[in-house]
Design a protein with these regions (language model features):
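Short histidine-centered beta-strand/loop micro-motifs
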Residues: 36-38, 56-63, 80-81, 89-90, ...
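Short, charged/polar surface micro-motifs in flexible loops or helix N-caps
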Residues: 42-43, 52-56, 73-77, 84, ...
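Short, conserved beta-strand element in jelly-roll/cupin
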Residues: 63-78, 82, 119
Length: 134
């Protein structure tokens, strides 16, 4: 019954389903996740938890839906690149949250270990290298 969300994410799908996923440590996790849940389309959500000890090395975006990020411990600084190229920054402490809108590139910085809960429209997620930090 009990499992570690950081190791085994949940898929929230059509029909109010909540399906535990295989280990996120599998190198093919995201590709296999998309294949398993593509029929849920933009309404499916991946619920995951990650602990970070270093700034992200990539930008990412979720073209098919918004992402909720909830800081559960530590401090996380989230950067969102707007369509006009400007960057908005939000610093989250435990209990704070931010929404990454659909299609908005985002990345994050930490200076000490921090943990966040993510609820993501994960199918179609894109990544690009990160060239700078703030």
């Amino acid at each position: 019954l009990v499992f570690r969300l950081a190791s085994f994410p949940i898929h929230l799908g059509l029909g109010a389903t909540a399906v535990r996923q295989p280990s996120i440590e599998d190198k093919d996790f995201f590709e296999a996740y998309a294949a398993r849940h593509t029929s849920d389309g933009a309404e499916g959500r991946l619920v995951s938890m990650f602990t970070f000890s270093q700034p992200w090395t990539v930008w990412e975006r979720h073209p098919r839906g918004a992402e909720l990020v909830v800081c559960t411990s530590g401090t996380i600084t989230v950067h969102q690149e707007q369509a006009d190229g400007t960057v908005q920054t939000a610093t989250l402490h435990a209990g704070d949250a931010v929404v990454n809108p659909p299609g908005v590139w985002h990345t994050a910085d930490v200076t000490a270990p921090a943990t966040a809960l993510f609820i993501t429209a994960g199918i179609g997620t894109e990544h690009r290298p990160r060239e700078s930090t703030w």
